[in-house]
Amino acid sequence: MEKWNREEFEEVVVNISRVTKVVKGGRRFRFSALVVVGDKKGHVGYGIGKAKEVPDAIKKAIDNAFKNITTVNIKGTTIAHDIEHKYNASKILLKPASQGTGVIAGGAARPVLELAGIQDILTKSLGSNNPATLVRATIEALERIKG
């Protein structure tokens, strides 16, 4: 496992959700955080953290994200070819775009692409909009791109 220099990476909190466990005495609340980290040079990762307080959940998610960093093949400011990928019920289509187009992406896919260092890309998300599955589908699609 590579040791990453955390100062070079940016972190984006994609989603924070409150989850509830119903027990005999009432409800127990916890927080779940989804974080994406990237250095804008072709390295990106995501992590999920759960804790009783939001800052603790975010810290755990960042730690998990650094354990899941992958390398993305970037061709100039975009990707090399079209790709379509499905993870669970989330499906994502990624298409290369000409320079100056920008990142055209919705929801949870945008921070993944921006933190990977991709500046020009067209995307379409189909199926489920669950942030966790959409982030994972986007990262898996980027991993499958051949240089």
UniProtKB/Swiss-Prot annotation:
Q: Which domain of life is it from?
A: Bacteria
Gene Ontology molecular function: any one:
rRNA binding
Q: Where is the S5 DRBM domain?
A: 9-72
Q: Which Gene3D superfamilies match?
A: 3.30.160.20, 3.30.230.10
Q: Which GO terms describe its biological process?
A: translation
Keyword line? Ribonucleoprotein, Ribosomal protein, RNA-binding, rRNA-binding
One Pfam family of this chain? Ribosomal_S5_C
The answer to whether UniProt assigns keyword Nucleotide-binding to this entry is no
SUPFAM superfamilies given in the database record: dsRNA-binding domain-like (SSF54768), Ribosomal protein S5 domain 2-like (SSF54211)
Cellular component (GO) terms are: small ribosomal subunit
Binding partners and assembly: Part of the 30S ribosomal subunit. Contacts proteins S4 and S8.
Read off the PANTHER family from this record: MITOCHONDRIAL RIBOSOMAL PROTEIN S5
Per the record, what about its domains? The N-terminal domain interacts with the head of the 30S subunit; the C-terminal domain interacts with the body and contacts protein S4. The interaction surface between S4 and S5 is involved in control of translational fidelity.
What family classification does the UniProt entry report for this protein?
A: Belongs to the universal ribosomal protein uS5 family.
- What does the UniProt function comment say about this protein? With S4 and S12 plays an important role in translational accuracy. Located at the back of the 30S subunit body where it stabilizes the conformation of the head with respect to the body.
Tell me which HAMAP family the record gives: Ribosomal_uS5_B
Could you identify this protein by its name?
A: Small ribosomal subunit protein uS5
Q: Which organism is it from?
A: Nitratiruptor sp. (strain SB155-2)
